[in-house]
């Protein structure tokens, strides 16, 4: 049973300007060390940071929440499985809320164009 869906778009240029202005202080506040390492190794890191930021926002929206509503962004980590597909690893408050709501599966999809990155999150579980 679907428990929630979330979608978000991030303007890549806008995020790149934030990265240039705040540098590591922004990155360390929003992304895990593994996410920072992954994105930093890419030819265009801002695209990958933007997609991951969109996934974090999409996850929050799928819960009916937003930034600043109790789940730190670092509790939502975007990684890739062995086939390269994106997956969300959840920690702390994010995991606690999923367990409380009976959510057992989190689906995430990422995409980007030259100017925008987007993500969709779908939450599934057994309970109503």
Curated annotation (Swiss-Prot):
One of its GO terms (cellular component) is cytoplasm. SUPFAM superfamilies: 4'-phosphopantetheinyl transferase. Gene3D superfamilies: 4'-phosphopantetheinyl transferase domain. Its main location: cytoplasm. It catalyses: apo-[ACP] + CoA = holo-[ACP] + adenosine 3',5'-bisphosphate + H(+). Transmembrane segments: none annotated. InterPro entries: 4-PPantetheinyl_Trfase_dom (IPR008278), 4-PPantetheinyl_Trfase_dom_sf (IPR037143), ACPS (IPR002582), Ppantetheine-prot_Trfase_dom (IPR004568). Keywords: Cytoplasm, Fatty acid biosynthesis, Fatty acid metabolism, Lipid biosynthesis, Lipid metabolism, Magnesium, Metal-binding, Transferase. GO terms for molecular function: holo-[acyl-carrier-protein] synthase activity; magnesium ion binding. Its EC number is 2.7.8.7. Mg(2+) binds at residues 8, 57. It is found in: Cytoplasm. GO terms for biological process: fatty acid biosynthetic process. Its cofactor is Mg(2+). Belongs to the P-Pant transferase superfamily. AcpS family. Transfers the 4'-phosphopantetheine moiety from coenzyme A to a Ser of acyl-carrier-protein. This is Holo-[acyl-carrier-protein] synthase. It comes from Syntrophus aciditrophicus (strain SB).
């Amino acid at each position: 049973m679907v428990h929630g869906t979330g979608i978000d778009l991030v303007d890549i240029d806008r995020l790149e300007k934030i990265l240039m202005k705040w540098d590591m202080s922004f990155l360390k506040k929003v992304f895990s060390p593994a996410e920072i390492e992954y994105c930093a190794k890419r030819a265009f890191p801002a695209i990958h940071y933007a997609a991951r930021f969109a996934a974090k926002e999409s996850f929050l929206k799928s819960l009916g929440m937003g930034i600043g509503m109790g789940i730190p962004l670092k509790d939502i980590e975007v990684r890739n499985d062995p086939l390269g597909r994106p997956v969300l690893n959840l920690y702390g408050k994010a995991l606690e809320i999923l367990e409380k709501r009976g959510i057992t599966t989190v689906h995430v999809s990422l995409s980007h164009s030259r100017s925008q990155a987007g993500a969709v999150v779908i939450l599934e579980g057994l309970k109503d």
